[in-house]
Amino acid sequence: MTRESINIGGRRSKLAVVQSNHVRDLVQAKFPQYDCTVFTLQTLGDQIQFKPLYSFGGKALWTKELEDYLYCEDQEKRLDLIVHSLKDMPTLLPDGFELGCVTKRVDPTDCIVMPRGSPHRCLADLPEGAVVGTSSVRRSAQLKRKFPHLKYQSVRGNIHTRLEKLDDPEGPFQCLVLASAGLVRMGLEDRITQRLHSDIMYHAVGQGALGIEIRQGDKKILQILDEIADLESTVCCLAERSLMRTLEGGCSVPIGVESSYDHKTKKLLLKGIVVNVEGTMAIEDQQEVVVNDIREDSIKCGVLLAHKMIKDGAKKILDEINLERVIQQ
């Protein structure tokens, strides 16, 4: 008797393959009757390595090519689900697609990585004019507020490529800012010099979580994903994505968040910050909601916080950022 198969898609980078294999293992452990196969594809974001993400607006850079295969006419090539770093998923998906689930989140913080042998242990140790490598305007904008004496330069490439650039004695960087989760998943946690908590930097929407994208209304796959979803991660990430969607920001716009959910009290706390590119203006606020309906109340929390922040001037900052991006293009 032929075993039924589930085709899992993801990007080709080493980190993406680790993440896709992790989801495959989660599904296989719960549903041993299925054959789970991982397929990898190159996306537009993988192909364009010479321009900063900020100049693209960040929407669908990592998802479009994979989405096409969810509706592929060739059944052998057709994907049943796609594994994304949730922070790379647009908050508004095209018709015919939906976020099927969020798996358990890994450390959502950003971190500082110093070159091997560096005497410096934190950002505050770095001398004036030291160059910090980051591909994210959210990161550089927030750090400019706290460390205006440092310089910030775009760095692209996968984790190993960035670390090679950092460790090169002839390279320009005195440190890198990376997502802690990526290093943890790649077995490189020992490279983390300093974790950046919210007193220094709010993390990206969905950072550290995996989002599983599926065909809209695919009941069979939804039932499978229900078994590997994580409640706390789902609640927090739905709220974070709702905040970003309401503020109309793409994944490279400087919106930072921090969220927590208490299972006993059902209280969800969402904090958010919007910073201009120069790091000279910031709107920061928070919202608490009791979650009775997981989807409805989590989304409501993000909407309420967004409206607070818009009232305080966040929209003005975001409009200026979007105008600057159009001029650069």
UniProtKB/Swiss-Prot annotation:
Identify the metabolic or biological route this protein is part of: Porphyrin-containing compound metabolism; protoporphyrin-IX biosynthesis; coproporphyrinogen-III from 5-aminolevulinate: step 2/4
Which cofactor does the UniProt annotation name?
dipyrromethane
Q: Name one GO molecular function term.
A: hydroxymethylbilane synthase activity
Which reaction is this enzyme known to catalyze? 4 porphobilinogen + H2O = hydroxymethylbilane + 4 NH4(+)
Any one Gene Ontology biological process term? Answer: protoporphyrinogen IX biosynthetic process
Q: How is the cofactor bound?
A: Binds 1 dipyrromethane group covalently.
At the top of the EC hierarchy, this enzyme's class is transferase
Q: Which GO terms describe its cellular component?
A: cytoplasm
Q: Which Pfam families match?
A: Porphobil_deam, Porphobil_deamC
Which superkingdom? Eukaryota
**Keywords recorded for this protein, A-Z:** Heme biosynthesis, Porphyrin biosynthesis, Transferase
Q: Which residues carry this modification: S-(dipyrrolylmethanemethyl)cysteine?
A: C251
Question: Which EC numbers characterise this protein's activity in its record?
Answer: 2.5.1.61
User: What family does this belong to?
Assistant: Belongs to the HMBS family.
What does the protein in this record do? Answer: Tetrapolymerization of the monopyrrole PBG into the hydroxymethylbilane pre-uroporphyrinogen in several discrete steps.
Further information in the entry reads: The porphobilinogen subunits are added to the dipyrromethan group.
The protein's name = Porphobilinogen deaminase
What does the record give as the organism's lineage?
Eukaryota, Fungi, Dikarya, Ascomycota, Saccharomycotina
